[in-house]
Amino acid sequence: MILLNRRRIMINPQDRSRAFNFALKMQDIFATFVGLSILWSIYALIFTQIEFIFISKVLLTVICIGFGTLTPLIDFNESHATNPLWTGHARFHLVWQVNAMILTSVLSIALLWFFYSVTNHLIVIFLNYLWIFSFYATVFGLKFFDGELNDINGVPPVLIKVFGRDYEIDRNIQAITGSLFVNSYAVALFFV
């Protein structure tokens, strides 16, 4: 588990813009939506005749919605794209990456729902894993380019309690790990 230190200066909501606070609130709401989607899928598997492929498509769509909406909400504010501590070139690459993620999400949803085929289903699975595994490759390579999961004025961590002990977990780790599990669940449903 990757834990964060406690040197964040934008923990207090009043230190952040309304847009940034809105993005963080939407991320929390979306996490609940993902949880409800998983519960729905379990219900659908046990109590309905809904095809596994359809459930897989819904779960992949949920991931795409997260990649295509939450990423720009979180990244297009003072924590990333307009972060005064970042160089203009770093911001350029961030916006480029986020735009690519948005376009990938739109393409994936179109492939799943408007141009469906088994091949397109597999392409969407692959595209989701591409974003997920490229994130983990970057996390594991942080020491090679002196990178960090978060900046001092970046996104605050998620606070969780495990066996009575408090932990701070980076929101990217939380979101991408959740995406990994949901995407893998969708893959299992696809191949059943």
Regions found by a protein language model. Name each.
Residues 46-49, 106-123:
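Juxtamembrane helix-break-helix junctions at the cytosolic face
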Residues 55-71:
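N-terminal signal-anchor transmembrane alpha helix
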Residues 95, 161-180:
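Individual transmembrane alpha-helices with interfacial aromatic-anchor signatures
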Residues 187-192:
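Juxtamembrane boundary at the C-terminal end of a transmembrane helix
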